[in-house]
């Protein structure tokens, strides 16, 4: 069976990617990261999801938190803002996060003989993160095949971002068709230890709107009820 490394945060998008990779016949090696994120309930969710979806393996890699300063997701002194429409890159941006995660996934993939890496990046319904853009994914794939023994020898890597052009509504519809239990997932930027979402951050807003517009019951446990 062909292998794939799937970046699994424990959120809605990455869980949908895991389900999609499995539906395509991959043995899925889930990879999660502990990098000092305040929403560490995601990692508990990732563990539940990997087990529930029968991943071939699930690794949680601990990174030095000093690598990720200046973000509301890693610095408790920076407040996570409520949702606001804006063209600016928000304070929830984590410096070079997807670059680092994909680099780690690439090394892991080459070591286990996997040539496919899945990431839940989307350029629709997102918060203007530069490392979620199609140009970034394409550039990293080029890098992967220039920087590895496998790539140089013609055994090329593919960076799969199947949600790249899907809205949150379409992602939820896809996941529902694949049988994803979204009640296991945690997307909130500041979920509490019980995994309850704030209902007010960007991630909560996109998620809540997505379920409503998709006509799918929202299984998220919210700390606060807000009208979206």
UniProtKB/Swiss-Prot annotation:
Gene3D superfamilies: HUPs
Keyword terms: ATP-binding, Ligase, Metal-binding, Nucleotide-binding, Queuosine biosynthesis, Zinc
Name the UniProt record assigns to this protein: 7-cyano-7-deazaguanine synthase
Known EC number: 6.3.4.20
Cofactor binding remark: Binds 1 zinc ion per subunit.
Top-level taxon of origin: Bacteria
Positions of Zn(2+) binding: 188, 198, 201, 204
Pathway entry: Purine metabolism; 7-cyano-7-deazaguanine biosynthesis
Broadest EC class assigned to this enzyme: ligase
């Amino acid at each position: 069976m062909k292998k794939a490394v799937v970046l699994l945060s424990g959120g809605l998008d990455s869980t949908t990617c895991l389900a999609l990779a499995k539906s395509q016949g991959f043995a899925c090696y889930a990879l999660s990261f502990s990098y000092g994120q305040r929403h560490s309930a995601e990692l508990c969710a990732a563990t539940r999801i990997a087990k529930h979806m029968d991943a071939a393996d699930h690794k949680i890699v601990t990174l030095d938190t000093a690598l990720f300063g200046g973000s509301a997701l890693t610095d408790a002194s920076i407040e996570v803002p409520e949702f606001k429409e804006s063209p600016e890159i928000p304070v929830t941006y984590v410096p070079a996060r997807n670059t680092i995660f994909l680099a780690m996934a690439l090394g892991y993939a080459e070591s286990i003989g996997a040539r496919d890496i899945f990431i839940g990046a989307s350029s629709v319904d997102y918060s203007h993160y530069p490392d979620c853009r199609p140009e970034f994914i394409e550039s990293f794939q080029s890098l992967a095949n220039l920087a590895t023994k496998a790539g140089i020898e013609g055994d090329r890597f593919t960076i799969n971002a199947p949600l790249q052009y899907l809205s949150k509504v379409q992602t939820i519809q896809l996941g529902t068709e694949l049988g994803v239990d979204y009640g296991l997932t945690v997307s909130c930027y500041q979920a509490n230890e019980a995994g309850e979402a704030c209902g007010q951050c960007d991630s909560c807003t996109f998620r809540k709107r997505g379920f409503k517009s998709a006509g799918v019951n929202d299984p998220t446990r919210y700390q606060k009820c807000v009208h979206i």
